[in-house]
Amino acid sequence: PCPSCVPNNVLGRANMTTASRKSIAICGACGCDKIVIHPCFSGDPTAPLDPEEEWNINIDFYSSFIPTLKASGVKCCLENMFITDKKGKSYGAICSDITETCRYIDTLNEIAGETLFGFCLDTGHLLMAGHDITFAIQKLGERLIALHVHDNDGYHDDHNAPYLGGIQNWNRFFLGLRAIGYKGDMNMETGNAVGRVPDALIPSTLRLLADTANYFRDVVLADETV
């Protein structure tokens, strides 16, 4: 579900928590070993949550999934978020601060008593927050277990194909993944790249996305220096 948490709505939070638990169980039943659940944050740049309150809400929120994660054999990924003000300016929101993100994951795994939590890095969200992708990946290290790969113009969450937006230097992405020995999936979160073309071009657009993902994989796993 999205949003996965409604911080100031008790009933909404309860409903989303229940839906997330069901989603975890469905993942397990389908043989999918990871799920991405967005963290809780205000979404209103004029009324952000107090940092301590935001921390406590999220620790409680994610901790509540531990029994279901264990029973389902699924790991839960947090994701870096962004926020946009009324003038269209984007800022990093919860989990854009990678140091804070590492603290979240390490704390939750300590509570769980095993490694049940990791991170999904969203390349488009990171661009909108103005953060360096190599630093983020290297700081996350083995905590990084999933990717949402897409591009945008730096202002809108376009979910466009790589090389069609503002991420001009994808080599920074490759360098980070190679540095940590990333072997996970190369998940292209690029629905808008398909949704914006005529039906006749959908097959070729899908081939382009598949070719791009395969190219990214090959570069990351190659022996030569990027």
Language model segments and positions:
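Active-site-proximal loop/turn and secondary-structure-junction residues that shape catalytic pockets
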Residues: 2-4, 39-43, 80-84, 123-125, ...
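Structural motif corresponding to the early beta-alpha repeats
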Residues: 1-60, 191-193
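Active-site-proximal beta-alpha loop/turn segments in soluble metabolic enzymes
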Residues: 40-51, 78-93, 196-197
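Conserved Rossmann-fold SDR core element
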Residues: 73-77
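Short, contiguous, pocket-lining structural segments
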Residues: 54-57, 93-97
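Histidine-acidic metal/acid-base catalytic patches
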Residues: 17, 21-25, 31-33, 49, ...
